[in-house]
Design a protein with these regions (language model features):
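C-terminal lobe and adjacent flexible extensions of AdoMet/dcAdoMet transferase-like proteins
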Residues: 208-253
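Class I SAM-dependent methyltransferase "Motif I" SAM/SAH-binding loop
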Residues: 45-49
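Conserved class I S-adenosyl-L-methionine
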Residues: 1-39
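A short glycine-rich, Lys/Arg-flanked "PGG" loop and its adjoining helix->strand segment in the class I
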Residues: 122-134
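Class I SAM-dependent methyltransferase SAM/SAH-binding core
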Residues: 52-94
Length: 253
């Protein structure tokens, strides 16, 4: 995964109701993280660090790794709490970025969609497995592209943000391609109800992604040595279904 700052002009901390999301996800994560071989957690693609901070509050020692220096700057700008470390580095060779072994790892928020081919995904999983203790879980969450392609869905739900200049709209458009790649277009729009035009583009970029399917994900995990897996359709622990689930959530060991 190469460094990218496609999201440099979008503050994701304002786009997500983080306290509610973290509490909801912890209900799911508390089960696999309840009996880890070590309290050290690895946060792959940590972004602005919300998960890392939350896990540290729960008593874990967390190392967050990301390839975006902009995201890491934002993660550090309010100070780094005890028990948290943020590192810049390539997830494909995370064993060269972090020191020691970990009792568990997470890769959440559709981070793996930035990995563009099967061999590279397998390499990433091998690298992660090399820094995990025996029996340590790797928890993965990506969008369920099987459902998105099957349904023809092109847009994720809109997010409306109030800021000092009024109201903004976060628009995320997807174009699915036959080779499994996705052109993702995150855009931030300024809305002025009395304006002409009423909508103005603040920032908009095309980001190349890969829409990983369940079988592809499992094949890469198998090749990397993760032989035991649990699959869910959301972090509400509902069973995974190819054409119905919003997410693909995997607990791999």
């Amino acid at each position: 995964m190469s460094p990218t700052n496609h999201y440099a002009h979008i503050d994701y901390r304002k786009m997500i109701a983080w306290p509610k999301r973290l509490e909801r996800e912890w209900t799911f994560l508390s089960a696999p993280f309840g009996s880890l071989p070590s309290k050290r957690l690895l946060d792959l693609g940590c972004g602005t660090g919300e998960h890392a901070r939350y896990f540290a509050d729960k008593g874990f020692e967390v190392v967050g790794v990301d390839v975006s220096d902009t995201m890491l700057e934002r993660a550090r700008e309010d100070g780094v709490p005890a028990g948290v470390q943020f590192l810049y580095g390539d997830l494909l060779h995370v064993e060269n970025v972090v020191a020691g072994k970990f009792g568990g790892a997470v890769c959440l928020g559709n981070t793996l969609a930035h990995v563009m081919d099967q061999d590279t995904l397998t390499q990433l999983f091998r690298s992660v497995r090399a820094v995990l203790l025996p029996g340590a879980p790797l928890v993965i969450q990506v969008l369920n592209y099987e459902r998105l392609v099957h349904s023809g869905q092109r847009c994720l739900p809109l997010t409306f943000i109030q800021d000092e200049e009024g109201e903004a709209i976060f628009l995320r458009v997807m174009t699915h391609h036959d080779d499994g790649s996705v052109t993702f277009t995150p855009s931030l729009l300024r809305y002025r109800k009395d304006g002409d035009p009423a909508l103005e583009v603040i920032t908009s970029h095309n980001v190349p992604l890969r829409g990983w399917k369940r079988a592809e994900m499992e094949a890469a995990l198998d090749a990397a040595g993760f032989k035991t897996r649990e699959l869910y359709g959301t972090m509400a622990r509902v069973p995974y279904a190819d054409h119905d689930s919003t997410d693909l959530v995997v607990i791999a060991r």
